[in-house]
């Protein structure tokens, strides 16, 4: 462990274990006391689990001690490399589900790979998962390895390893080369530096690599699986006070993807007259043809251009702005602001709002990913700043205590 002599390492371990047990008890209590499917109930359960995970990570570090904790960089990277190799090798599919074991010699013959290589990779991928060693040279699936059989989880992992990991490993080189300045370009950032994209953004680079783009798209569907929709916090039924007409646009979902958010909004406004519009790039809009309620209009739109829908009651942009540097964000917001009607239109932004202090694990790693792309997750102060540059001001922030995601309501100044 190698703690300084004046520190009682076992007292630290006992205190850490106490904190971990208390977090586990809170997690269990929250699970039993908050069974409802509301956003508040889901958020309470997620926050309790996040706290438990953070306390577990802290306890692991205490148990390891300063030197061993630093040395786990070898362990973590080796474990990730082993799992990535086994994924490409086809081992995840070759092992049967249902907790049935197979021997390495059988797998090696079936996959036409070197048995010694396979055994070494499986050995390192079974110490604490995702696989389980059940006997000499015998391995089987666990729920943690079976998760990788899902296309969205597989895509997320592949994209993290093949695209983001190289950017993280080259982060220090890029920052040093650029005088330790915050990355703020979509075409000159740690990602483009690591992948040598020759002036192309990540998205332009991926468009030339179909398999990588497929992994990215599959991985992004994980985000859509969240039960935490911050738009649920907005009082949609209060729009009835405006006495909307059938021809009035109640909501425009900008960059709305498959239309899940605008469909959700329409259900909240059920019975209110008005139009609902989904906007996204042309190929995205075409992909949802036939899958949306006919009452929801579809419109091809690039949010870096003039907003064609003017005077809508509500404009929504959800989980898009964190992908862009400040200048781009201000441009997007200015296009929306120019279409808004004073005293009538509001803009809703669903994004992470990074706490001013003691940020959590999610907002931490998410911001590092955004940094590699020249973008960022923002604090409320930073959101107020970019909105101000676009002629907007924050009226209200809808947020659940302990949750980093929020819904920012902004109006014209």
UniProtKB/Swiss-Prot annotation:
Binding site for S-adenosyl-L-methionine: 255-256, 280, 302-303, 319
UniProt keywords, alphabetically: Methyltransferase, S-adenosyl-L-methionine, Transferase
GO MF term list: O-methyltransferase activity; protein dimerization activity
Active site positions: 322
Pathway: Secondary metabolite biosynthesis
Pfam families (alphabetical): Dimerisation (PF08100), Methyltransf_2 (PF00891)
Cross-referenced Gene3D superfamilies: Vaccinia Virus protein VP39, Winged helix-like DNA-binding domain superfamily/Winged helix DNA-binding domain
Essential cofactor(s): S-adenosyl-L-methionine
Keyword S-adenosyl-L-methionine recorded: yes
GO aspect biological process, one term: (+)-kotanin biosynthetic process
EC number: 2.1.1.-
PANTHER family the UniProt entry points to: HYPOTHETICAL O-METHYLTRANSFERASE (EUROFUNG)-RELATED, PUTATIVE (AFU_ORTHOLOGUE AFUA_4G14580)-RELATED
Function: Non-reducing polyketide synthase; part of the gene cluster that mediates the biosynthesis of the bicoumarin kotanin. The non-reducing polyketide synthase ktnS first catalyzes the formation of the pentaketidic 4,7-dihydroxy-5-methylcoumarin from acetyl coenzyme A and 4 malonyl coenzyme A molecules. Further O-methylation by ktnB leads to the formation of 7-demethylsiderin. Then, an oxidative phenol coupling catalyzed by the cytochrome P450 monooxygenase ktnC forms the 8,8'-dimer P-orlandin via dimerization the monomeric precursor, 7-demethylsiderin.
Annotated family: Belongs to the class I-like SAM-binding methyltransferase superfamily. Cation-independent O-methyltransferase family.
Protein known as: O-methyltransferase kntB
Gene it is expressed from: ktnB
């Amino acid at each position: 462990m190698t703690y300084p002599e004046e520190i009682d390492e076992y007292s630290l371990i006992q205190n850490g274990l106490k904190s971990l047990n208390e977090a586990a008890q809170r997690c269990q209590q929250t699970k039993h006391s908050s069974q409802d499917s509301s956003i508040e109930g889901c958020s309470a359960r997620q926050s309790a689990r996040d706290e438990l995970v953070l306390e577990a990570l802290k306890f692991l570090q205490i148990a390891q001690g300063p030197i061993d904790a630093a040395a786990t960089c070898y362990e973590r990277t080796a474990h990730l490399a082993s799992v990535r190799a086994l994924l490409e090798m086809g081992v995840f599919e070759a092992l049967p589900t249902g907790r049935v074991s197979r021997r390495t010699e059988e797998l090696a013959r079936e996959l036409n790979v070197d048995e010694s290589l396979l055994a070494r990779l499986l050995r390192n991928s079974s110490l604490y998962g995702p696989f389980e060693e059940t006997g000499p040279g015998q391995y089987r699936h666990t729920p943690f390895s079976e998760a990788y059989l899902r296309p969205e989880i597989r895509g997320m992992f592949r994209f993290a390893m093949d695209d983001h990991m190289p950017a993280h490993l080259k982060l220090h080189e890029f920052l040093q080369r650029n005088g330790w300045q915050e990355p703020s370009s979509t075409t000159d950032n740690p990602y483009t530096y690591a992948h040598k994209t020759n002036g192309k953004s990540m998205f332009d680079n991926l468009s030339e690599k179909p398999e990588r783009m497929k992994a990215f798209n599959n991985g992004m569907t994980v985000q859509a699986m969240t039960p935490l929709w911050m738009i649920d916090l907005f009082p949609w039924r209060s729009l009835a006070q405006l006495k909307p007409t059938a021809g009035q646009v109640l909501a425009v979902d900008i960059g709305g993807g498959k239309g899940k958010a605008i469909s959700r909004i329409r259900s909240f406004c059920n019975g209110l007259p008005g139009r609902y519009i989904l906007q996204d790039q042309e190929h995205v809009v075409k992909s949802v043809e036939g899958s949306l309620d006919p009452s929801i209009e579809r419109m091809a739109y690039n949010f870096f251009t003039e907003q064609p829908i003017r005077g809508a009651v509500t404009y929504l942009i959800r989980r898009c702005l964190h992908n862009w540097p400040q200048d781009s964000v201000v441009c997007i917001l200015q296009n929306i602001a120019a279409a808004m009607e004073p005293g009538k239109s509001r803009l809703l932004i669903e994004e992470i709002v990074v706490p001013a202090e003691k940020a959590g694990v999610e907002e931490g790693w998410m911001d590092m990913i955004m940094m590699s792309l020249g973008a960022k997750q923002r604090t409320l102060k930073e959101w107020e700043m970019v909105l101000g540059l676009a002629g907007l001001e924050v009226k209200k922030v809808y947020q659940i205590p302990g949750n980093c995601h929020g819904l920012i309501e902004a109006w014209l100044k």
